[in-house]
């Protein structure tokens, strides 16, 4: 029988529930258990696909094409289970499905209410994510996860928020139905240090647990976040006023790398408490690979700096998976990768010289016209000065636009996203494609923004003799999230000018990778997909590994010139 661990948060948001949940999952997996994670988001958006990165951070794309919360990226990087559409759902999805059922008459004329209809729907979504299907049409509609031993369910938001109440009530009911040996509650809270008083304050934690108990939930474990280890005296005080056993009050202090958190939680007995509560007999945890990973992170042999030219630079969460993928590749090369954000809105031909100090340049994905000319400047500077360049999604498109303007003689080349009536639309809207499941998707300029992009895992053929072929072999399969592509009408003109189309889909002839020959540039690649979503700290990713290797070579060359 599948066991459930519910992870909630209190006092303030952004405490790291996702990292805590993923760390617990990693420890349980090291004990031989099959684990999955499910994220419940209380906002009314159907998914985060149309939300601003400044509001939400990165949108993580799963293999099956779901646009999900960035925490699912942490989940995939911490455990071996791959996330699916069923691993993340929102209030918007829940209410939408309830209202559709009401319109169909599924409720047989009953008054539709938050309790029981919305809370029952939440429970069904949770169970599907844990591999427990309901044998209804919703199983096919939303997908069902693989059966697991333990499902860790992270409830977004903060206890006390109005939006979270139906979710908390739903998991309270679910825990009652399943029994105390099949469910556990872990509550992440905040213990602030007041500098003027010179002490940690436990009152906010007492109040957030009181709020949970009013709802009918008694936490089994408290993860107490602070900027320092919490002394035993304060832990005893928290235990007394929250009715949580002392050994269940765990100190979680700030760490210089998230990969230290599994060891931190294990050494304080979190996994042992959960296994005892859920009556799970397992082998001892083995975190040796986490220890090796932390050692690699803390003892790099070399150091490089990457310039990331984007417009969401004020919030690093906008590029969370990308940042991690670069660091993973650095680990593979025993190198520390520093990432310096360059605001593309301020980048002009006159200021482009500031890019000369970097070991490589990267233009990430994005949407909209704002900052686009600065990204084109970054691509041009990298091409003209032999600096390793990686363009991802929009980054490939701006590299194509730049090459069309300055090498293919297509003055005014642009994307129809930014200039619908431009003279040379070298990037244009995709109107038809075939998904991995064989279904044909069609779109036009009047399609809704939400859920209408080319999403999820897609495959393409790789041209022999290219850098792309060295990295991927004959076929590349990566996750996508875009609605614009290189215009097929201009491909021959671009190739005649020297741009290499190194990966292309069989059916639609959509351009997936472009590059420059090694004889022209040491490492210049653009990809239409998002390889960062498949990178892990254990294996890295071959594209990023090749990119970082080129950056290290460029760094060595710069040092040699300076000597």
From Swiss-Prot:
Its EC number is 6.3.4.2. L-glutamine binds at residues 366, 394-397, 417, 483. Mg(2+) binds at residues 71, 154. The active site is at 393 (nucleophile), 530, 532. ATP binds at residues 14-19, 71. It catalyses: UTP + L-glutamine + ATP + H2O = CTP + L-glutamate + ADP + phosphate + 2 H(+); L-glutamine + H2O = L-glutamate + NH4(+); UTP + NH4(+) + ATP = CTP + ADP + phosphate + 2 H(+). One of its GO terms (molecular function) is glutaminase activity. One of its GO terms (cellular component) is cytosol. It holds the Pfam family GATase. It comes from the Bacteria. NCBIfam families: PRK05380.1 (NF003792), PyrG (TIGR00337). Homotetramer. This is CTP synthase. It comes from Leptothrix cholodnii (strain ATCC 51168 / LMG 8142 / SP-6). The gene is pyrG.
